[in-house]
Design a protein with these regions (language model features):
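Hydrophobic membrane-insertion alpha-helices, especially the h-region
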Residues: 25-41
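Catalytic domains of cell-wall/extracellular-matrix polysaccharide-remodeling enzymes
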Residues: 141-265, 273-278
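Hydrophobic alpha-helical segments, especially transmembrane helices
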Residues: 22-24, 176
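Short, charged, surface-exposed secondary-structure boundary motifs
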Residues: 99, 117-119, 211-213, 270-273
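N-terminal Lys/Arg-rich, disordered targeting/topogenic segments
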Residues: 1-22
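Active-site beta->alpha N-cap acidic-glycine motif
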Residues: 52-147, 151-165
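Sec-dependent signal peptide cleavage junction
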Residues: 38-58
């Protein structure tokens, strides 16, 4: 039989255990709140991005067409520019064959490290001879070097010079690897680009073809879903799945009443996420 003192001790111990448990719960909760707050503040203050984060089209700033671009769309109706990055490659000739078959001119943004491969240079010359535009896509395609180490203009100059040496043309249009945002957000580097007479082109539709190996149908669907305006610039790459998808992409735009256009330096269309009308 428990005495009153025993009852008191039991109640005291129970209250003590509850009090300790409550303090423990409060301590853990406070720690978790502080941890979550710290992680949030760090994530909000981050100023660098990985290429994987940068290339997501959902995070893109909508392109604000220049008045010249609006006039072109009004004068010509629906216009689409097919663009191909990362060449020249072993697929360049096949892309040119397919484009020739459909009587379509395209815009290529070629990489310096590939342009230096002499066995691919005939395809670069052929592209220009057949009426396509060849612009620059940097020498290295390295985000850190181009944007953080401020080598964008020197690399583009070197790549444009290579194109001139191979083709005799003097292009001024470049496509920033991973797009112009956020790498070219600094006005200082944009001033350098403008002073160098370089023009930038981003895109209105990212096909995401580079990540869709063996999925040409998904590439086509991405482009269909992204097509919303009378003036579209489609980002693609020299990939096997892109080559396979291209006939369906061409047929889609023909059915939708689009005309295929190639970049013309005398009629520059502003097409950069930065909305910088100098570029």
């Amino acid at each position: 039989m428990m005495t009153p003192r025993s009852n008191f001790s039991l109640r005291h111990e129970t209250r003590s255990m509850r009090s300790k448990r409550t303090r423990f719960i409060i301590l853990v909760s406070t720690f978790l709140i502080v941890l979550a707050t710290t992680i949030f503040l760090i994530s909000q203050s981050r100023t660098t991005f990985t290429p994987e984060e940068i290339i997501e089209p959902q995070n893109r700033v909508p392109v604000d067409m220049s008045k010249k671009g609006d006039r072109e769309a009004e004068n010509q109706g629906k216009v689409v520019y097919l663009t191909f990055d990362d060449g020249p490659s072993k697929l360049t000739a096949k892309l040119l064959d397919l484009l020739k078959e459909h009587d379509i001119k395209a815009t290529f943004f070629m990489q310096g490290s590939q342009l230096q491969r002499t066995q691919l240079q005939n395809d670069v010359r052929r592209a220009v001879q057949e009426g396509h535009y060849v612009g620059a896509h940097s020498m290295t395609h390295q985000y850190k070097k181009l944007y953080q180490e401020k080598q964008f203009v020197p690399e583009m100059h070197e790549t444009l010079s290579l194109i001139h040496d191979i083709t005799g043309e003097k292009p001024h249009l470049v496509r920033p690897p991973y797009g112009s945002v956020p790498g070219l957000a600094s006005k200082q580097i944009r001033d350098q680009i403008a002073e160098a007479g370089i023009k930038l082109w981003d895109w209105t539709i990212d096909s995401n073809d580079w990540r869709l190996k063996d999925q040409p149908n998904e590439i086509v669907e991405n482009i269909k879903r992204g097509t919303k305006s009378n003036l579209e610039v489609v980002l693609m790459h020299e990939k096997p799945q892109t080559l396979e998808a291209l006939p369906d992409i061409i047929n889609f735009y023909k059915q939708e009443g689009y005309k295929f256009a190639v970049y013309d330096e005398s009629e520059h269309v502003q097409m950069n996420f930065l909305k910088d009308d100098r570029l």
